[in-house]
């Protein structure tokens, strides 16, 4: 095992749930404002998950006051407190970029049974 692999292995989180594109998740993010730290929840649909190991990232999309907001998080980031899975989505794609063009009910994803 290389030295970098050993460092990467020690930095991986073990509390990451199994989730994928189409799942609706609550990402609890640590936000530091001045000397205070608080937890902010970002709820949305996972539109992609890419990379592997310590470099793995996922992108969450939500509609906020009619404006689409996307945020990309590293899976193993220390700034993420925890991730809750709200619903499992039934999708046939690994990257859901087509959701960017859809609004309202058309942007809704069927729930996995």
Swiss-Prot record:
<dbReference type="InterPro" id="IPR018257">
    <property type="entry name" value="Ribosomal_bL19_CS"/>
</dbReference>
<dbReference type="InterPro" id="IPR008991">
    <property type="entry name" value="Translation_prot_SH3-like_sf"/>
</dbReference>
<keyword id="KW-0687">Ribonucleoprotein</keyword>
<comment type="similarity">
    <text>Belongs to the bacterial ribosomal protein bL19 family.</text>
</comment>
<dbReference type="GO" id="GO:0003735">
    <property type="term" value="F:structural constituent of ribosome"/>
</dbReference>
<dbReference type="Pfam" id="PF01245">
    <property type="entry name" value="Ribosomal_L19"/>
</dbReference>
<comment type="function">
    <text>This protein is located at the 30S-50S ribosomal subunit interface and may play a role in the structure and function of the aminoacyl-tRNA binding site.</text>
</comment>
<protein>
    <recommendedName>
        <fullName>Large ribosomal subunit protein bL19</fullName>
    </recommendedName>
</protein>
<dbReference type="GO" id="GO:0006412">
    <property type="term" value="P:translation"/>
</dbReference>
<keyword id="KW-0689">Ribosomal protein</keyword>
<dbReference type="InterPro" id="IPR038657">
    <property type="entry name" value="Ribosomal_bL19_sf"/>
</dbReference>
<dbReference type="InterPro" id="IPR001857">
    <property type="entry name" value="Ribosomal_bL19"/>
</dbReference>
<dbReference type="GO" id="GO:0022625">
    <property type="term" value="C:cytosolic large ribosomal subunit"/>
</dbReference>
């Amino acid at each position: 095992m290389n030295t970098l692999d050993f460092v990467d292995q020690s930095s991986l989180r073990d509390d990451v749930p199994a989730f994928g594109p189409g799942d609706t998740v609550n990402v609890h993010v640590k936000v530091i404002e001045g000397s205070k730290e608080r937890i902010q929840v970002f709820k949305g649909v996972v539109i992609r998950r890419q990379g592997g190991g310590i470099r793995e990232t996922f992108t969450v999309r939500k509609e906020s006051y009619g404006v689409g907001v996307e945020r990309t998080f590293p899976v193993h980031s220390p700034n993420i407190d925890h991730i809750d899975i709200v619903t499992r989505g039934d999708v046939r794609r690994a990257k859901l970029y087509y959701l960017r063009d859809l609004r309202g009910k058309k942007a809704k994803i069927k729930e996995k049974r």
